[in-house]
Every structure is written in structure tokens, then in C-alpha cells.
Amino acid sequence: VILLLLIASAPSVDAQPKTKDDVPLAPLHDNAKSALQHLNQRCCQTFYWCCGQGK
């Protein structure tokens, strides 16, 4: 029983210190969203059906 309590109170993976190689995910998400919006705009200008309005 004591062993189970010790395991449950151990630090989780999220508690690890950040390293210099860690990259925040928010900028990556913003870049991906921006790229998809740009591709969608180019596609809609060229092909009416690919932006979902031609259905």
C-alpha cells in the first residue's frame, strides 16, 4: 500500500524541466493555421469547388 502511495505522488512527465531544444507549440500551430489559410485562399481563387462553396 505504501509503495502505491509513493508511485501516485511521484512527479509526472509534465514536471520535467524545459531544455533549450523545447519549442512552444503555439507558434507552430499559428504557422500551420496561417499556411492552411493561404493555401485555401489560393485554391479558392483558382478552383471554385475546392473551398467547399461549390457543393
Swiss-Prot record:
It comes from the Eukaryota. Pfam families: Chi-conotoxin. Contains 2 disulfide bonds that can be either 'C1-C3, C2-C4' or 'C1-C4, C2-C3', since these disulfide connectivities have been observed for conotoxins with cysteine framework V (for examples, see AC P0DQQ7 and AC P81755). GO terms for cellular component: extracellular region. The keyword Signal applies. GO terms for molecular function: ion channel regulator activity; toxin activity. Expressed by the venom duct. Keywords: Amidation, Disulfide bond, Ion channel impairing toxin, Neurotoxin, Secreted, Signal, Toxin. The modification Glutamine amide is found at Q53. This is Conotoxin vc5b. It comes from Conus victoriae (Queen Victoria cone).
